[in-house]
Amino acid sequence: MERILLCFIVATLVAISMANPRPISIDPPCWTCYYRDSSGNCAFDAIACGGARKRVPKPISIDPPCRTCYYRDSSGNCVYDAFGCGGARKRVPKPISIDPPCRTCYYRDSSGNCVYDAFGCGGARKRVPKPISIDPPCRFCYHRDGSGNCVYDAYGCGAVRK
């Protein structure tokens, strides 16, 4: 019984192959990722060739590509893309302010004045900067007295106290 079934399957396969013989082709086979189109030319098959790992060639564009952090808008101009440029590591440019920034340990209050911030100034290890003085510093061996004048200081300049 098995022999009869096996002979029947073989006879069926032979009959099918005889009914649809392969045409004899004069053209050589196409390369990998190519197929023969209706005109007989080898054409690239981007969809069936290698799946996602195969890169499809980009279409040729008349416009050159935009620089990093820029994209081409609908009118064809390169426009800066602040949000899509490098993620969180990329700093967005700060808005231009008319007021200059406050010094260290100071902050700008609601009226626009720089106010000293004792609590937010780095703790005990942070030295508070000295206030800016209009008077220039005194020369070596001199110090500024209570009236703001530079006075010679003999003891602060290597003299021996009695």
Curated annotation (Swiss-Prot):
Major site of localization recorded for this protein: secreted
Disulfide bonds: C30-C42, C33-C49, C66-C78, C69-C85, C102-C114, C105-C121, C138-C150, C141-C157
GO molecular function, one term: ion channel regulator activity
Subcellular location(s) per record: Secreted; Nematocyst
Region forming the signal peptide: 1-19
UniProt keywords, alphabetically: Cleavage on pair of basic residues, Disulfide bond, Ion channel impairing toxin, Nematocyst, Neurotoxin, Proton-gated sodium channel impairing toxin, Secreted, Signal, Toxin
Transmembrane segments: none
Coiled coil: none
Residues excised as propeptide: 20-23, 56-59, 92-95, 128-131
GO CC, any one term: extracellular region
Domain comment in the entry: Pi-AnmTX Ugr 9a-1, AnmTX Ugr 9a-2 and AnmTX Ugr 9a-3 have a structural fold called the boundless beta-hairpin since its beta-hairpin is not stabilized by disulfide bonds.
Family stated for the protein in its record: Belongs to the sea anemone BBH family.
Protein name: Precursor protein UG
